[in-house]
Amino acid sequence: MYTVITVPAFTDNYIWLIRHENHCLVVDPGDAAPVLDRLAALDLQLDAILLTHHHQDHVGGVTALLKHFPHARLYGPKHDPMPDHHGQWLDDGDQINWHGLSLDVIHVPGHTHGHIAYHGHSMLFCGDTLFSGGCGRLFEGTPAQMHDSLQRLAALP
């Protein structure tokens, strides 16, 4: 069984933990402090960091988290890699497997050129592509790219 834990960050962001027993993944850790606090409070081991895109409010905590959990794996978009970190850079159609959980990688350009989303097990982690109130802003992509990306997300089961 997997549990998604919401970790508030900054004034309007969320960081996501995916928990399985005493292990977890973290998605888009823009700030390490609230993640480290939650991991300590729940006695969780961080196995991997999943990034959707390169903006600081999504990657700002990576360095500190990797210092605390040096064996954690780093995953992120192939077309938006973090040059200062060794990671596995993912593209559309790739898949991450962790403790029986399979997450498919979907390239969803629009907010950024290399933006990716992770989908599987009735979960979607789509970074700044889609919010409950609408879509994300365009920083690098075009309206046509964002439209196509939103159509891909809308077609998911």
Describe the residue ranges of each PLM region.
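Short N-terminal signal/transit or membrane-insertion segments
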Residues: 48-55, 109-119
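Short, flexible coil/turn micro-motifs enriched in small/turn-prone residues
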Residues: 55, 88, 95, 105, ...
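Active-site HxH/HxHxD metal-binding segment of metal-dependent hydrolases
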Residues: 10-11, 24, 29-104
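Divalent metal-coordination and catalytic microenvironments
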Residues: 18, 28, 53, 65, ...
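Conserved beta-strand hairpin/beta-sheet module of binuclear metal-dependent hydrolase folds
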Residues: 1-44, 117-133
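Residue-level detector of functional hotspots within protein domains
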Residues: 4, 76, 80-82, 104, ...
